[in-house]
Amino acid sequence: MGKFEVYVDASGKYRWRLKAVNGQVVATGGQGYATARSCREGIESVKKHSATAEIVEVEA
């Protein structure tokens, strides 16, 4: 099973990354969060909305 990791970056912001079973990073949060709690809320939002998200192709 994959896992979300919460960590603190060099500027002191909380960030998350999603790792696959093999340890490969497959997604990262696009922003830094001021608190660990707000970072976890960001993860929960991704989990909630990605379950029903469409896949759309966009042209460059």
Which residue stretches match the model-derived regions?
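Short N-terminal "domain-start" leader segments
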Residues: 1-15, 19-21, 27-29, 45-59
